[in-house]
Amino acid sequence: MEKLALFDIDYTITRKETLMEFFKYLVSKDIKNIKFLPRALYSGLMYGIKVYDEKRVKECFLKFIENIDEKELAILTKSFYDERLSTILYEDAVNMIKKLKNEGYMVILISASPEFYIKEFYAIKEVDLIIGTKFIFENGKFVRKMSGNNCKGEEKVKRLEKVLKEKNMKEYMDERTED
């Protein structure tokens, strides 16, 4: 029986919330992106008072990369990982990933963060699979629309179950909650 090691990303293997770090990183690369700060604050407020759900808040928030070319976004996310994400990793978490992989575990990172940048965590060679929130690209451009649901809570469980089924694996857990 193959053993699984599941890790969330934000505040589990990173010290900070990665989507905000992505926004801050792009502002540091082009100060003109600061014009999207009011939208970010508004989105957060609407989520905080329960007017927006997580899907809508993410779609609204990501205006700062709307219509960016998919290849350009890939270059940005690679530099984001190299210059920023890799500096906020918990060393203990990375060491645990390496230890568990060495013990024969299949290592999966599963997060509500956008998959278009968390896939850069494959730079940690012990990571076997990354599951995140998927977004749509149309004609090679980012369009701020989520493909399906935000990968959090029950959706995270569904996505994991789908992967396990595809790999012909079984799951056993004592609780079906995740915050």
Residue ranges and their predicted role:
Residues 17, 68, 155:
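Conserved active-site and cofactor/substrate-binding residues in soluble primary-metabolism enzymes
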Residues 34-36, 71, 170-173:
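Short, surface-exposed acidic
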Residues 2, 75, 82-108, 112-179:
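C-terminal cap/substrate-recognition subdomain and adjoining C-terminal extension
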Residues 44-49, 58-70, 130, 134:
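Short, compositionally biased "basic patch" segments
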Residues 31-32, 52, 70-72, 91, ...:
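Conserved alpha/beta cores of soluble small-molecule-handling proteins
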Residues 1-49:
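Active-site neighborhood of HAD-like aspartate-dependent phosphohydrolases
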Residues 56-91:
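Metal-dependent phosphoesterase signature
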